[in-house]
Amino acid sequence: MSREIRSLESIISDARENTHEKMLIRKQRDMTTDIAPERDLQGRFCSLRRIGEGTYGVVFKAIHVRDNVKCALKMIRTDRDEEGIPSTCLREISCIKDLQHDNIVTLFDIIYANSKLYMVFEFIDRDLKNLLEMLEPTNSVLPPNYVKSFMWQLLSALSYCHLRRIVHRDLKPQNILVSDSGVIKIADFGLARNFSFPSRNYTHEVVTLWYRPPEILLGSQRYSTSLDMWSLGCIFSEIASNKPLFPGECEISQLFKIFEIVGTPNIKSWPGVDSFPHYKAVFPQWPVNLKKLEETSCLTGNGLDVLREILRYPPERRLTAKGALSHRYFLQNGFTQNRPSVTDLMKDIRAQNRTPPLLNNHQEKSIF
């Protein structure tokens, strides 16, 4: 074992001591032999361009020299004096390294060099949020065949993950990549984790606010795959209407926006809801408002039925990813799994907008 790998193992073993991380750390120790030792990164990658930055590092677009393949380099800062490798990075590697699915972003390599961890992913030109933003100037929405294709691919990826007992916990348009050929890829597994049966307590600090399910907002720490399904329901509505379904400004605002459409829950509609830490008997009482759901989501017929079956409480009554794939929504009108071209769609959008393509104009910058 090389010095670099031993060093990484030392960081991992010293970085996390609390109970919730121990299983993840053990898995990561087993994985250190898969992490490449320090190499001449400058000789392996070229045409580097910074395309994003997060709490723990920076993402660069690059080209792998030998294979002439575009890739995304996620550079993770490590600090031996503080936390070392962030837990989100450990979780992402642990969850995604063995996932092989057409609709999940591929992790090509893991490189530890110069006290930094590099995760090398396949590169996709845009995310779903970028695509939806291009439609805004003309108040347009995605054509129905795109909506259905995107939803099918997302459900396929989630069904695959959930079968392997992995819950993503942070589904949102920014974490869904869209290729020119119309292929959808779920990315950013930084909050993902393996779940257990029966369910156990987990942190409730998951999922971006607009896509957070009501049980989490009410303080529940017990959840499983139904959490992802609620988020996907919100995304389904958003890609059909090009506007967020529940755009709350804070947690209580988010709850009330949900209640205004799905109805205020009670012990009859949701047995046990009164036991959640943040549940209040004095919540405003809203009835189920299917008309508002239809108007907001722009979905009708079988599409609206899928959305209704997903946005249900209690969570165990929600449609599963596997179940949704068998819904008549995907069986009507001769639906096929052929992916509509996003390149053609963007040409039409730009023609209407008369604007140049969305490009990231950051200058090339060395990361070494």
Swiss-Prot record:
Known catalytic reactions: L-seryl-[protein] + ATP = O-phospho-L-seryl-[protein] + ADP + H(+); L-threonyl-[protein] + ATP = O-phospho-L-threonyl-[protein] + ADP + H(+)
GO cellular component: chromatin; cyclin E1-CDK2 complex; cyclin-dependent protein kinase holoenzyme complex; cytoplasm; nucleus
First-level EC class: transferase
GO MF, one example: metal ion binding
Cofactor(s) required for function per UniProt: Mg(2+)
Subunit structure: Interacts with cye-1; the interaction likely regulates cdk-2 activity and is probably required for gld-1 phosphorylation.
Role description: Serine/threonine-protein kinase which, in association with cye-1, regulates proliferation, quiescent state and cell fate during the development of several cell lineages. In the embryo, initiates the establishment of cell polarity through the recruitment of the centrosomal proteins spd-2 and spd-5 during prophase. Phosphorylation and inhibition of the translational repressor gld-1 by the cdk-2/cye-1 complex regulates the pool of germline stem cells and the size of the mitotic zone in the gonads by preventing entry into meiosis.
Protein name as annotated: Cyclin-dependent kinase 2
The species this protein was found in: Caenorhabditis elegans
Record gene name: cdk-2
